[in-house]
From Swiss-Prot:
Function of the molecule: Catalyzes the reversible cleavage of pseudouridine 5'-phosphate (PsiMP) to ribose 5-phosphate and uracil. Functions biologically in the cleavage direction, as part of a pseudouridine degradation pathway.
Cofactor binding remark: Binds 1 Mn(2+) ion per subunit.
Protein family according to the UniProt entry: Belongs to the pseudouridine-5'-phosphate glycosidase family.
Lineage per the UniProt record: Bacteria, Pseudomonadati, Pseudomonadota, Betaproteobacteria, Burkholderiales
EC number: 4.2.1.70
Record's protein name: Pseudouridine-5'-phosphate glycosidase
Location of the active site: E30, K164
S-S pairs: none
Keyword vocabulary terms for this entry: Glycosidase, Hydrolase, Lyase, Manganese, Metal-binding
Residues that, per the record, bind Mn(2+): D143
Entry cofactors: Mn(2+)
Length: 314
């Protein structure tokens, strides 16, 4: 499919279209976190607060979802509310885009799905909570998130709080290395682990300055090296959960999922909801804090990338 034909599926909101026309930096946001990652009304409230943070820093937020047979880039208040309340939105990764677009049903984009749509819309930076990855026990199940393949093929910089701690983070990083995806960190040397700050695994490069991050990313793409760059930043210390506690609760939730025969796309929403229940809601507060922090890091990166692009033109 030609790029023009693919872009014909896009509907940009007025603010996103105006920002793109003016050359203002854009930050893509996923919708799975709204539809499946948090309960209502915290999901919609957090979405509004994250968008406001990005705007305050000088970039334009572009939350992405599939609505009525269109890829919507930038959502209205009513569309955010619809996503947050629905409970029936499909999780949309690469394989699901054709099905949900042709059916016209409501679709919430995953990391992979959002990367594809962001690239079509010309957006270079995407902020999420945590990426998917290699699931524990993948040696037997082959349960590996499509997010990792998308990072290898789609040229979007992804800002996250590491990989979700329910995953095998060591194998996730090994997979990314095999696929040639650079893993950057800021604020610390080690890759983050979602609810907790430190996964115990060292990342490829630490770059704290947004201008340095932008130069790294721009150089990769200038060399014709297609694919994304992953930038990990830890959850703020005040909101982080203790490693021993979250590890034990994660294992308990995983055991429950296995006992109940929960597999595939249903695993992550089940685990997040179960951990929220087991922590009395504290994990949700941590999730909200890390997404907001990621949004700040992502907005600054988008500004730096835009400035670097202007400098190259000059």
């Amino acid at each position: 499919m030609s790029t023009d034909l693919a872009q014909s599926w896009l509907t940009l909101s007025a603010p996103v279209a105006a920002a793109r026309a003016a050359g203002r930096p854009l930050v893509a946001l996923e919708s799975t976190i709204i539809a499946h990652g948090m309960p209502y009304p915290e999901n919609v409230r957090t979405a509004h607060e994250v968008e406001a943070l990005i705007l305050e820093l000088g970039a334009e937020p572009a939350t992405i979802a599939l609505i009525d047979g269109r890829i919507r880039v930038g959502l209205s208040d009513d569309e955010l509310e619809r996503l947050g309340r629905s409970g029936k939105a499909h999780k949309v990764s690469r394989r699901d885009l054709p099905a949900v677009l042709t059916s016209g049903e409501l679709g919430a984009t995953t990391v992979a799905g959002t990367m594809i749509c962001a690239a079509l819309a010309g957006i270079e930076v995407f902020v999420t909570g945590g990426i998917g990855g290699v699931h524990r026990g993948a040696q037997e199940t082959f349960d590996i998130s499509a997010d990792l393949q998308e990072l290898a093929r789609t040229s979007v910089a992804v800002v996250c709080a590491g990989a979700k701690s329910i995953l095998d983070i060591g194998l996730t990083l090994e997979y990314l290395e095999t696929q040639g995806v650079p893993v950057l960190t800021c604020e610390q040397e080690n890759f983050a682990a979602f609810y907790k700050r430190d996964s115990g695994f060292r990342a490829d490069y630490r770059l704290d300055d947004p201008a340095e991050q932008a130069r790294f990313i721009r150089t990769k793409w200038d060399l014709g090296l297609a694919g994304g760059v992953l930038l990990s930043t830890p959850v703020p210390e005040a909101a982080a959960m203790a490693s021993e506690e979250i590890d034990a609760l994660t294992q308990q939730a995983l055991d429950e999922a296995q006992a109940q025969g929960i597999t595939g796309k249903a695993v992550t929403p089940f685990l997040l909801a179960r951990i929220k229940a087991l922590t009395g809601g504290r994990s949700l507060a941590t999730n909200i804090a890390l997404v907001k922090h990621n949004a700040e890091v992502g907005a600054r990166l988008a500004l730096a990338l835009a400035q670097a692009a202007r400098g190259a033109v000059a």
